[in-house]
């Protein structure tokens, strides 16, 4: 959706309706200038794919995904790959019971 929006620094997603979304793969891929992201209103009950969702978001320093329902997610491959400045990541409510691919999930997340 915001694939390679390399100049994107901030975005207001408060009115996004995500209740029927099944894949958020590549959603913020290579948004290297994105500094802040509030996804607290996202409904993820039907979500199955999170592959490379935040891949290359190297300016993000914190991300709160505690509201994400990941009960149906099967792939998180490279979801946070190369989020080099990410220091605070809240995934406290993630359920990975059905995830079959977590490869490279936090690769090059040197600040975590």
Where are these regions (language model features)?
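Negatively charged
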Residues: 1-112
């Amino acid at each position: 959706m915001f694939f390679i929006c390399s100049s994107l620094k901030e975005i207001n997603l408060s009115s996004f309706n995500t209740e029927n979304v099944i894949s958020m793969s590549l959603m913020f891929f290579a948004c290297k200038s994105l500094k802040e992201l509030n996804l607290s209103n996202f409904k993820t009950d039907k979500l199955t794919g999170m592959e490379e969702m935040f891949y290359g978001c190297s300016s993000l320093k914190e991300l709160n995904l505690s509201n994400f329902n990941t009960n149906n997610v099967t792939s998180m491959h490279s979801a946070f790959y190369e989020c080099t400045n990410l220091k605070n990541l809240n995934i406290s409510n993630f359920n990975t019971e059905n995830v079959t691919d977590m490869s490279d999930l936090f690769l090059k997340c040197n600040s975590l």
